[in-house]
Amino acid sequence: MVIEETIAELVLNGRTLVRAGCLPDSLEDFALGFLASEGLIAGPEAVASLSVSPDSRRIEVRAAVDPDLLVAFRERLALSTGCGRGASAAAENLPQVASDAWFTPDDLLDRMKDMDAAAALFRETGGVHAAAATDGPTLLAFAEDLGRHNAVDKVIGRCLRQKIPLAGLAILSTGRLSADVLTKAARAGVPVVVSRGAVTSLAIQLAGPADIATAGFARARKMNVYTAPWRLGLAER
């Protein structure tokens, strides 16, 4: 099976914001999640309209966005490097996540297994990443995409569209947890991020002050916890 890829152009208020190589599905979720995870909107109530072209190559969004936030986004985008085609890699001074949520390691490891079980396209092709959102006992959202950033954006967007509060969720990912993914979680207000892969030093550095729990190599019945262990019931707050 050959994976279908498209270049989707996200247009905000008549101006191109970003172009992303992605799977041509759940693009409404992707757009909403991207805007939230880049700090441009607080939630779906800021969006007046959102439409996807029939060929899945153009996503048109009309939304109330603070001009200063848009300027800051474009400055970050100009500085960003690597495969994170968003602007998150240049993040500094992230806000502390306002959440009292915590999770048990057993629940998170169980949900990682659920995410892997749901990853049908990966099993068929071996060419996509998966991401999911959980409240602990339940897997609430799931997405696959060519890029780990896109998959995370789709999950965040789906939760926003379903009015699921992000402050009570953990994001799970099959991809490396780097600074750009961590900053997406922070700007969206997600308190816990768990990866099946590695966590980078800059992600750990940014997660500590933001009070985000980060964990990597979550496989079988083990994980490495790097920051905010209280959110996994492993320390006092």
Predicted ranges, named:
Residues 118-164, 170-171:
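Histidine/lysine/aspartate-rich catalytic loop segments that bind and position anionic ligands
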